[in-house]
């Protein structure tokens, strides 16, 4: 029997209440970016739209699990809508604690999470305004950010100029996640068509020689030098789950095969054999590049194992879920209830100086997936 209840109980009874009590800025009806180890908020660098969007998802999804969650999610969404929108389209990167503009650049990563938040808020409340936010953001992305070489431009600076540095796979992954979510909550095929285009981009450009690359040139060739050789096991696992989800929705067997290729690479090279944790970074040849371990890749691995358990004949996936949950409690979910070790060295020593709100999204997603299969949904 999977130890799902242990993780869910920790999340619902410990983590969610802490972030609702200590991580929610009642004065400004939005969420703080980070908490100190004594759970006091860190407010010096304002608030990113990314964090508000992720917390909208988290507290919307678990609205029935804790009092006040739904209200907090809705008020954070209102804060996003009234304070974080850019006047010429899309979403600014960062605002002050009170919501005044602080960084008017528009990162594709932020735009993707604004779409996702709109989809999740619509699913939770049925409010057409939430759906409109997601649709309007997608229209901005398509009209203003389409790149001639495929995909979308990375960043529009505060002065309106398009940033011409390296391109990343990660914002495209989260946009894929967002449009899949929109299709699932609306049934509108136009969102599925966007997902199909992003799948083709990923298959043809972002996955090279059976590994998911992180950084690319303007024409979506792997970046020169070591940046083009870096791969992240956590992002591989994130894509495993997404590709299985896409395969289920679209009946695309090739997506299942691709998911298996990424999954097998991580199983072969991505785990610390001594601790059972997922490394931060490898090279494309499977060589260890960074032995540190962030919290979020461990949660994405749980989601990937769930997908393999559901959609393949992998008879070891269930054992990997059990081991992954045990590993979380051994190395990350320790200390004061509701806290975690965000980033640890190979020996398990924490070296990250706070609790970032952005990680709650990863925990929520993993718990939600585990709870879903535990309930037989």
Q: What do these predicted regions represent?
A:
Residues 1-377:
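Glycan-recognition and catalytic cores of secretory/periplasmic carbohydrate-active enzymes
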């Amino acid at each position: 029997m999977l130890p799902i209840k242990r993780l869910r109980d920790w999340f619902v009874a410990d983590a969610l209440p802490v972030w609702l009590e200590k991580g929610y800025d009642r004065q400004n009806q939005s969420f703080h970016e980070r908490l100190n180890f004594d759970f006091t908020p860190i407010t010096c660098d304002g608030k990113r739209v990314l964090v508000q969007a992720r917390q909208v998802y988290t507290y919307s999804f678990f609205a029935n699990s804790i009092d006040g969650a739904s209200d907090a999610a809705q008020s954070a969404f209102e804060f996003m809508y009234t304070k974080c929108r850019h006047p010429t389209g899309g979403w600014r990167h960062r605002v002050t604690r009170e919501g005044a503009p602080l960084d008017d650049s528009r990162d594709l990563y932020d735009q993707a999470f604004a779409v996702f938040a709109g989809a999740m808020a619509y699913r939770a409340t049925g409010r057409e305004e939430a759906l409109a936010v997601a649709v309007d953001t997608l229209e901005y992305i398509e009209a203003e950010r389409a790149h001639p070489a495929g995909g979308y431009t990375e960043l529009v600076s505060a002065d309106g100029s398009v940033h011409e540095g390296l391109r990343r796979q990660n914002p495209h992954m989260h946009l894929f996640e967002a449009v899949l979510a929109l299709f699932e909550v609306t049934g509108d095929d136009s969102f599925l068509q966007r997902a199909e285009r992003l799948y083709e981009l990923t298959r043809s450009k972002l996955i090279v020689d059976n590994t998911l690359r992180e950084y690319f040139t303007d024409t979506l060739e792997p970046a020169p030098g070591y940046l083009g050789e870096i791969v992240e096991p956590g992002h591989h696992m994130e894509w495993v789950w997404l590709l299985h989800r896409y395969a289920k929705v679209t009946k695309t067997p090739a997506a299942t095969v691709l998911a298996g290729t990424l999954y097998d690479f991580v199983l072969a090279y991505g785990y610390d054999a001594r601790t059972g944790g997922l490394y931060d970074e490898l090279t494309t040849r499977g060589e260890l590049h960074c032995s540190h371990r962030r919290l979020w890749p461990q949660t994405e691995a749980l989601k990937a194992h769930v997908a393999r358990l559901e959609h393949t004949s992998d008879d070891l996936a269930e054992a990997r879920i059990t081991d992954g949950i045990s590993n979380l409690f051994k190395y990350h979910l320790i200390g004061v209830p509701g806290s975690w070790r965000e980033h640890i060295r190979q020996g398990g020593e924490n070296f990250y100086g706070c609790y970032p709100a952005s990680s709650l999204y990863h925990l929520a997603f993993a718990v939600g997936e585990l709870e879903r299969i535990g309930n037989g949904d």
